[in-house]
Every structure is written in structure tokens, then in C-alpha cells.
From Swiss-Prot:
Name of the molecule in the record: ATP synthase epsilon chain, chloroplastic
Main location: plastid
Pfam family membership, one: ATP-synt_DE_N
Subcellular compartments: Plastid, Chloroplast thylakoid membrane
Cystine pairings recorded for this chain: none
Gene3D superfamilies assigned to the protein according to its UniProt record, in alphabetical order: 6.10.140.480, F0F1 ATP synthase delta/epsilon subunit, N-terminal
Keywords: ATP synthesis, CF(1), Chloroplast, Hydrogen ion transport, Ion transport, Membrane, Plastid, Thylakoid, Transport
Family of this protein: Belongs to the ATPase epsilon chain family.
Listed NCBIfam families: ATP_synt_epsi
Quaternary structure, from the entry: F-type ATPases have 2 components, CF(1) - the catalytic core - and CF(0) - the membrane proton channel. CF(1) has five subunits: alpha(3), beta(3), gamma(1), delta(1), epsilon(1). CF(0) has three main subunits: a, b and c.
SUPFAM superfamilies (alphabetical): Epsilon subunit of F1F0-ATP synthase N-terminal domain
GO molecular function: ATP binding; proton-transporting ATP synthase activity, rotational mechanism
CC per GO annotation: chloroplast thylakoid membrane; proton-transporting ATP synthase complex
Length: 133
């Protein structure tokens, strides 16, 4: 038995196909979803989506949103998403270094919040590449 996973951003469909299992980063921690999972709606945190497909694990960086799970259908609506295989490792590392520098020199509450958010996004992209090695 499989699940149908659909990952959507405001601009595109990132994923729409059958999967065996997922592990999703939510605001209250990670949840694993197998076929016949209980229906749930949950907030999605900035984090890694792990997808098991035909015995292999794939990863995707998710940039926050929400997910609806029910009747073996998973719909994930996020601000942005990127497959781990599509992320350029060198570019992601450079972005992380810039985000870390910006976080260190951020002044004022708003600037610190924005720098922290950019840092979390950059870390997630790097971690997505390294998650299933």
C-alpha cells in the first residue's frame, strides 16, 4: 500500500506521486506517516522532509507551511521547497556562511528575527543534502 504525496509552493508543484512513507518536520517535532495514518492537519516547520520510495530515501528542504494528511493522501503546502538532489552543495554552503555572518552582525529585534530565519533556511538546505548519505 502507498501514499500519494503532493508538495506545493505558491509557484509550482514540487512533488506529486506515490510514496511508501514520509518523515515530516512539524512545529511540534517530526512525525512519520505510513499508509492508513490517522487524519491530521499540522503546521510544517522549516526542516527536512524525508521520503521513502521503492526502498530508497530522498530528501526535500521545506520552508514552512502546513500539511493535511488523510485517506492515504498527503498534501503539503509550503512557502518554498527544494529537492535535496536539486540543491547545489557549494552554493548552499556559501549561503550558510553569509547567513551566519549576517546573524552575528544583526542589530535590533527585527533584523535579528529576519537573520535567524535566513540562517534556519540556509542550515536546512545544507542539512537536506547531507541527511541521507
Amino acid at each position: 500500500m502507498t501514499l500519494n504525496l503532493c508538495v506545493l509552493t505558491p509557484n509550482r508543484t514540487v512533488w506529486n506521486s506515490k510514496v511508501n512513507e514520509i518523515i515530516l518536520s512539524t512545529n511540534s517535532g517530526q512525525i512519520g506517516v505510513l499508509p492508513n495514518h490517522a487524519s491530521v492537519a499540522t503546521a510544517v516547520d522549516i526542516g527536512i522532509l524525508k521520503i521513502r520510495l521503492d526502498g530508497q530515501w530522498l530528501t526535500m528542504a521545506l520552508m514552512g507551511g502546513f500539511a493535511i494528511i488523510g485517506n492515504n493522501e498527503i498534501t503539503v503546502l509550503v512557502n518554498d521547497a527544494e529537492k535535496g538532489s536539486d540543491i547545489d552543495s557549494q552554493e548552499a554552503q556559501q549561503t550558510l556562511e553569509i547567513a551566519e555572518a549576517n546573524f552575528r552582525k544583526a542589530e535590533g529585534k527585527r533584523q535579528k528575527i529576519e537573520a535567524n530565519l535566513a540562517l534556519r533556511r540556509a542550515r536546512t538546505r545544507v542539512e537536506t543534502i547531507n541527511a541521507i548519505s
